[in-house]
Amino acid sequence: MLEQCSKNIEKLRNKCPLTHCITNYVTINDCANVVLAIGGSPAMANEAPEIEEFVEAAGVTIINMGTLLEDQIEPMQIAACHTKKTNTPLVLDPVAVGVSKLRNDITIDLINKSSVDVIRGNMSEIKAIANLFNITDEKSVAKGVDVSSDDIITKDNIKSNASLVKAVADKLNTTIAVSGAIDIISDGVSIYLIDNGEEVMSKITGSGCMLTCVIGSFCAITSPLEAAIIGSLSMAISGELARRKMEINNEGSGSFRTYLIDMMYNMNDETIMKYGKLYKLE
C-alpha cells in the first residue's frame, strides 16, 4: 500500500486539480499554500451564490468548520448537497464538533445532506461524531479545536480507538482520517496506522486544516482511502523533516511552519518510501 499510495504525488502534480476550499479565515492562507505545494490548484470560494458553480468546476470540495460564521453555514450546506448531486468528492473537517450545540447540529446536517468521502479530525472530534450518530455512548470532553488529553492516541489505546474509527467509517459509509501522534485511517473495512507523528505540529495553528486540504487534493485523483493515507503520510513526513531543519538551525515554530510547506513542495514518492511508517492493523 505504501508504494501504491506514493505514486499519487506525481499523478496529482500532473493533473493539478482545482481544490475548492470552504475554510476558516484563521488558516486560509496556509491552506492555499499547502495545496499549491503538494500540486493542487486552490480556490477559496465561500459565497453562497457561486458555490454550485465552483463545485461543478472543481475536482474536490472541502468544508472546514473552524470559524463557523453565520454567513458560512449556507455555503457549506449548498456544497454538501451539490457535491452529492454532481458526484464531486467531498472532504469534511468538523472542527470542534462536540463543543457546542451549533457545531453538533451543523455536523449532523452536513453529513446527512452529503455523500462525504473523507472526514478528517482529531480523536475527540471523531468520538463526538460517534456519539452524535449513536455509534457509541462514550462521552468526549472536547478542548476547543484541540484534542482532549484523554483522547490522545497512544500505543496503549490504539486498538480501541482504531476499532471505534472503523465503526464510524462503516456506519457513515465514508473514510475517517484521525490525526495525532499516531494517525488512524479506516474506510470501514481496513484500518491503517501512520507512526510519523511530529509534536511540533501542535505548536502552529492550522496544521490540521492544511492536512484536510491536502487529503482533499488527493481525493480529486484517487480513492478516498488512498487519498487519506498519502495525504497524511505527506504531511507527517514533512513535519518530521521540518522539525529536523528547525533544530539544526536552532530556530522555532515560525520557521517550522515555513519549512513544513517547503517539505511538502519537495515531497515525492522516494521520500514517502524512505520515511513512511505505514502499518495495516490486522
Curated annotation (Swiss-Prot):
The keyword Transmembrane does not apply. GO terms for biological process: thiamine biosynthetic process; thiamine diphosphate biosynthetic process. This is Hydroxyethylthiazole kinase 2. GO terms for molecular function: ATP binding; hydroxyethylthiazole kinase activity; magnesium ion binding. Belongs to the Thz kinase family. It catalyses: 5-(2-hydroxyethyl)-4-methylthiazole + ATP = 4-methyl-5-(2-phosphooxyethyl)-thiazole + ADP + H(+). Keywords: ATP-binding, Kinase, Magnesium, Metal-binding, Nucleotide-binding, Thiamine biosynthesis, Transferase. InterPro entries: Hyethyz_kinase, Ribokinase-like. It is an enzyme of class 2 (transferase). Pathway: Cofactor biosynthesis; thiamine diphosphate biosynthesis; 4-methyl-5-(2-phosphoethyl)-thiazole from 5-(2-hydroxyethyl)-4-methylthiazole: step 1/1. Substrate binds at M44, G206. CDD domains: THZ_kinase. Catalyzes the phosphorylation of the hydroxyl group of 4-methyl-5-beta-hydroxyethylthiazole (THZ). Its EC number is 2.7.1.50. ATP binds at R120, S179. The keyword Magnesium applies. Its cofactor is Mg(2+). Transmembrane segments: none annotated.
